[in-house]
Regions:
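Short, Lys/Arg-rich, polar N-terminal cytosolic tail immediately upstream
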Residues: 1-6
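Alpha-helical transmembrane spans of integral membrane proteins, capturing the lipid-embedded, hydrophobic core
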Residues: 9, 13-22, 40, 44, ...
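Short, hydrophobic transmembrane alpha-helix segments
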Residues: 22-37
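Short amphipathic alpha-helical segments enriched in hydrophobics
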Residues: 30, 45-56
Length: 223
């Protein structure tokens, strides 16, 4: 662990908390939005714990996860579309609470919170299995194909997990309209997967054989 990495992680975490809080509670017009606090808790408490663990046990992996500068223009567009999707989803959820648009039952939101936490556990498992993971599409020096654990089920388990994470977010927030907005995520991530696989086939030794071995990209038995 380095001092620079610590302050970089702390700064991004703090900015994330403030930004998400503003996007949810400002449109809601109040801090008495229970679903908003529930979401903030299940998002940032596990994130903080995971960050501490990675800082001491896998600082290099944490450093890669904090680096989000895409080298490819096309992937930069994908990242921007994802960002717009999140902004719209959070703002609509807040507005929905403020103006009493259709809200999901509390029990459904609690179920969404459980699904979100399960996805977080799976997210941690993917990080444990694949130390080459970064937030940008690239092939790293001495990188090897991972074909065990969740990687033996689908070729992109990180995206599978984030799909569950992101689709459970609006459910936790109790917003049907926000859920409809985040349904655009599979379309966005499908484009990213296509570009990533083209790069991996070209630059990562053994990836073609891995594709033949593991048939599904994102969802078992579907795609």
């Amino acid at each position: 662990m380095t001092v620079k990495l610590f302050f970089n992680a702390l700064a991004k975490f703090t900015i994330g908390v403030i930004l998400v809080g503003l996007l949810i509670f400002l449109p809601a017009g109040t801090f008495s939005y229970f679903n908003g606090w529930l979401f903030m808790a299940i998002l940032f408490i596990p994130m903080f714990i995971a960050g501490i663990v990675m800082m001491f046990k896998k600082p290099l992996l944490l450093s890669k996860r904090l680096s989000a500068k895409e080298k490819q223009k096309e992937q930069g567009i994908v990242v921007k579309l994802s960002g717009l999707m999140f902004i719209a989803g959070f703002v609509v959820a807040g507005l929905g609470y403020r103006f009493s648009w259709y809200s999901l039952p509390t029990g459904v939101s609690i179920g969404g919170a459980v699904a979100f936490l399960v996805a977080y556990v799976l997210y941690a498992e993917v990080l444990r299995e694949n130390t080459y993971l970064s937030r940008t599409i690239e092939v790293q020096e001495n990188q090897k194909v991972i074909d065990t654990g969740l990687y033996s089920v689908v070729r992109h388990p990180m995206y599978s997990v984030t799909l569950l994470l992101f689709l459970s977010m609006p459910i936790v927030l109790g917003s049907l309209y926000s859920f409809i907005i985040l349904l655009s995520y599979p379309l966005i991530i499908a484009k990213r997967i296509k570009n990533e696989e083209e790069l991996l086939e070209k630059e990562l030794n053994g990836y073609r054989e891995y594709k033949q071995k593991v048939k599904y990209r994102l969802i078992p038995f579907i795609w």
